Amino acid sequence: MSEKKIALITGATSGIGESTSFELANQFSLIICGRNKDKLYELSNELSKKTNVKTLEFDVRDKEDVREKISSLSDDWKNIDILINNAGNAHGLDFIHEGKISDWDMMIDTNVKGLLYVSKYVLDIMIENNRGHIVNIGSIAGKEVYPKGNIYCASKFAVDAISNGMRIDLNKHNIKVSQINPGLVETNFSMVRFKNDRERSNSVYAGLNPLVGDDIAKVISYVINCPENVNISDITVLAKSQASSTVLNRK
């Protein structure tokens, strides 16, 4: 195996995670993580043309599976330099009194607890090595609450607080912590949120020139390739057509 640094990416099989995998493939050996075994296999085959690839199949919500899979990494793979906490989702867009508890559980379990589970077991490695860089994918929804965003916004506000807490607690261990907060990004995000309602999903991006996964992947690459003494702690990325969570210039 080459001397490239190792980057672990959660939610690697679609959207921002998939774009980031391809963006980083020329520079890093990659551990790609996701729930879909077939998609992981297909992505691994493509990425292996450019770099060394290891796949870990797990659901970030399952803390025992997360622990087991990360603990199973061989000596060649266990010294993770970069963690991209990308796995996340939104479910529903409802007034809080009309929301579904199952949707709330999915968002909190994935966006908050899942991020914590993966971070916990990777940090055991990074602290031992006295180095590392964690990049948490937040959201503009973690900076501004918008109508019907309630629980999704809460989950991303939690990511914001966790990122800040990590940066403080891990400073003495020589570990950088960055957070990237995208605005509207045209991925499968809205299809998941609206339960595969394509018409409703498409309406989110109608009349806009939104960000795409590759845009955020380039920002991630920039953040992790800054000089060793530079830590970009927090960055919000919007399309030109988006001024805030609710102010959009539709054509």
Language model regions located:
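Substrate-binding pocket helix/loop in short-chain dehydrogenase/reductase
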Residues: 94-96, 100-105
